[in-house]
């Protein structure tokens, strides 16, 4: 989905590119590659970006499948940092950390001060994780068994979990101090932690 910030529309595309448009006119302001195709087969060349760009503090954070975590500077209109990683979801900025749920359901965290890897976790490997959100200072995501997991973003340690549904959790989002979970059967749950 497009993200609107300061009269600009930020969109990531199936071809692995980020584009920024003027909201009023639709005029393309700038674009850049999140990652480049590097394989020899169609499957290896799949670099789809289904995640929403995250726009914060003059920077745009993007991810794509079989690609990169990439940070673009909106003033310079170019990538200023990237890291090889595969993800279906938008990265999360929380408590000075940049966190990515990888496509294999492992987690990777980077310090926002140094952009060096802070911690990684394979505790949820191949559990078909949902997107992650920051909520009340914690990182929260769902899994294929209908659980939500609560993680301390500073060290990656699981501090809680709760069974929400018997179906896999597909999406988590927060609005107005509430946490919402959508499962594979399109059931919506409102959670207060």
Give each language-model segment a name.
Residues 22-26, 73-76, 111-115, 152-156, ...:
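Short loop/turn segments that connect beta-strands within beta-propeller blades
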Residues 12-14, 18-24, 31-33:
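Surface loops at the rim/top face of extracytoplasmic beta-rich domains
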Residues 1-6, 27-57, 79-95, 104, ...:
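Extracytoplasmic beta-rich repeat domains
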Residues 6, 13-14, 57, 64-65, ...:
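Structural signature of WD-repeat beta-propellers
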Residues 11, 62-66, 70-72:
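Structural recognition of beta-strand segments within beta-rich domains
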Residues 114, 138, 143-187, 193:
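C-terminal closing repeat unit and adjoining cap/tail of repeat-based domains
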């Amino acid at each position: 989905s497009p993200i609107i910030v300061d009269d600009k529309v930020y969109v990531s595309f199936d071809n692995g590119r980020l584009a920024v448009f003027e909201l009023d006119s639709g005029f393309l302001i700038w674009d850049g590659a999140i990652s480049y195709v590097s394989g020899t087969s169609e499957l290896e060349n799949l670099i789809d970006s289904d995640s929403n760009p995250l726009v914060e503090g003059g920077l745009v954070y993007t991810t794509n499948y079989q690609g990169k975590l990439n940070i673009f500077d909106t003033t310079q209109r170019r990538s200023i940092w990237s890291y090889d990683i595969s993800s279906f979801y938008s990265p999360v900025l929380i408590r000075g950390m940049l966190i990515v749920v990888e496509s294999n359901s492992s987690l990777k965290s980077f310090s926002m001060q140094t952009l060096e890897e802070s911690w990684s976790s394979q505790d949820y490997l191949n559990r078909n994780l949902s997107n992650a959100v920051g909520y009340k200072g914690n990182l929260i995501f769902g899994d294929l068994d209908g659980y939500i997991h609560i993680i301390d973003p500073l060290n990656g340690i699981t501090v809680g979990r709760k069974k929400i549904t018997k179906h896999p959790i597909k999406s988590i989002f927060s609005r107005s101090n509430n946490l919402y979970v959508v499962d594979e059967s399109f059931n919506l749950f409102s959670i207060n932690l």
